[in-house]
Amino acid sequence: MGLLFNNLIMNFDAPSPWGIYFQDSATPQMEGLVELHDNIMYYLVVILFGVGWILLSIIRNYISTKSPISHKYLNHGTLIELIWTITPAVILILIAFPSFKLLYLMDEVSDPSMSVLAEGHQWYWSYQYPDFLDSNDEFIEFDSYIVPESDLEEGALRMLEVDNRVILPELTHVRFIITAGDVIHSFAVPSLGVKCDAYPGRLNQVSVFINREGVFYGQCSEICGILHSSMPIVIESVSLEKFLTWLEEQ
């Protein structure tokens, strides 16, 4: 139960029943996405109440007036036409510029400290650390399969646990190089603000900077076959000392 408490109560880094909001952010790009969502939601709420007030006012005036068609000879109103043309344009600009800025910032991959190659297969992920060698002087690499429900430990998350986690150091610029070996997959970890399609024969890349320790869960987000739901992703962020110890054990 300790694992479940740490993952779901202290930090919401995994899907939870009846969840209605984002998982807790662990990277600057995810914090930016949450802030953008909240700002856009503010505009949407204002629009909702504004349009609702106008609609209710029209209905009330229509019901209370003696002549239901008292404005049948009104052809146009220049002022109101300007208002309903300019106001949406201004709102769209206020939404567009922050989203464009965030989009370009998320697309930048500058001077990463290390790289991880993630390759999607039917139906598992394989990972490679091209910057580090194991005891056989080969790149550190491994496959990551879902843990069957019959093998889950108490407190583990169903359909989300894997046999081999991706271990990364916190406070480090990491570049994920993402591809696929058969069909199209998608590498998605909500707490990290990462969602990148994996195409056979093509390399995509995303940058992450994990600002705290934790275990972050994701899944393949592109329908890729009958066991599409059996491709979880688990990334564990640890201190630099623990990461170096893990490297020595490989």
UniProtKB/Swiss-Prot annotation:
Q: Which reaction does it catalyse?
A: 4 Fe(II)-[cytochrome c] + O2 + 8 H(+)(in) = 4 Fe(III)-[cytochrome c] + 2 H2O + 4 H(+)(out)
Binding, Cu cation A1: 185, 220, 224, 231
Give the EC number. Answer: 7.1.1.9
Cofactor(s) this protein cannot do without: Cu cation
Summarize where Cu cation A2 binds, as residue positions. Answer: 220, 222, 224, 228
Which Gene Ontology terms describe the biological processes this protein takes part in? ATP synthesis coupled electron transport; mitochondrial electron transport, cytochrome c to oxygen
According to the record, the segments passing through the membrane are 28-61, 78-107
InterPro entries xref list: CcO_II, CcO_II-like_C, CcO_II_C, Copper_CuA, Cupredoxin, Cyt_c_oxidase_su2, Cyt_c_oxidase_su2_TM_dom, Cyt_c_oxidase_su2_TM_sf
User: Which residues are recorded as binding Mg(2+)?
Assistant: 222
This protein's GO cellular component annotations are: mitochondrial inner membrane; respiratory chain complex IV
Q: How is the cofactor bound?
A: Binds a dinuclear copper A center per subunit.
Membrane topology is: Multi-pass membrane protein
Q: What coarse category fits the chief subcellular location reported for this protein?
A: mitochondrion
Spans within the Mitochondrial intermembrane topological domain: 1-27, 108-250
Identify the domain of life: Eukaryota
Keyword annotations for this protein, in alphabetical order, are: Copper, Electron transport, Magnesium, Membrane, Metal-binding, Mitochondrion, Mitochondrion inner membrane, Respiratory chain, Translocase, Transmembrane, Transmembrane helix, Transport
Give the main EC class. Answer: translocase
All ranges on the Mitochondrial matrix side of the membrane? 62-77
- GO terms for MF: copper ion binding; cytochrome-c oxidase activity
**Where does the record say this protein resides?**
Mitochondrion inner membrane
Q: Which family does it belong to?
A: Belongs to the cytochrome c oxidase subunit 2 family.
Subunit structure, interactors included? Component of the cytochrome c oxidase (complex IV, CIV), a multisubunit enzyme composed of 11 subunits. The complex is composed of a catalytic core of 3 subunits Cox1, Cox2 and Cox3, encoded in the mitochondrial DNA, and 8 supernumerary subunits Cox4, Cox5a/Cox5, Cox6, Cox7, Cox8, Cox7a/Cox9, Cox6b/Cox12 and Cox6a/Cox13, which are encoded in the nuclear genome.
Q: What functional role does this protein have?
A: Component of the cytochrome c oxidase, the last enzyme in the mitochondrial electron transport chain which drives oxidative phosphorylation. The respiratory chain contains 3 multisubunit complexes succinate dehydrogenase (complex II, CII), ubiquinol-cytochrome c oxidoreductase (cytochrome b-c1 complex, complex III, CIII) and cytochrome c oxidase (complex IV, CIV), that cooperate to transfer electrons derived from NADH and succinate to molecular oxygen, creating an electrochemical gradient over the inner membrane that drives transmembrane transport and the ATP synthase.
Name the chain's protein: Cytochrome c oxidase subunit 2
Q: Which organism is it from?
A: Neurospora crassa (strain ATCC 24698 / 74-OR23-1A / CBS 708.71 / DSM 1257 / FGSC 987)
Higher taxonomy = Eukaryota, Fungi, Dikarya, Ascomycota, Pezizomycotina
